[in-house]
């Protein structure tokens, strides 16, 4: 029964499911930067809050990657998109009233939610279906991308607020620096 249900969700029979093409080529909106002849940025143009500039994995400081994994998904390298131990921890926290048990979403699930957002106001059944969809999309993302590519997409897409979308914009807006110059405590 459970596998059949996941098959229906995965096949898009129970609501939206991104196509293989959409998973392989997610829409990314990066800011357009205008440079002077001497290399200084004259201006930026971006849509909505998508004030971001792409950053390669090799250019992301290890301290930023370590901070992300330590705070969001300590078993990131040990799962395939769904952290079953984390889900049991959250369920136990809900049953015992322990609100400090933390969340159960993995970095990949959070990326799935960022890449394929859905309506915010939903009833319990719609929320449950959205969570199942996130799990399926997370597993598909893990099959399509390396862990490094997932971290790169996440850090280039995450909204740090105040028009700081992506690690490049966040480092600049909050610390007036570039990601490679962030101190460990800033990461």
Identify the function of each model-found stretch.
Residues 1-35, 75, 95:
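N-terminal type II signal-anchor transmembrane helix
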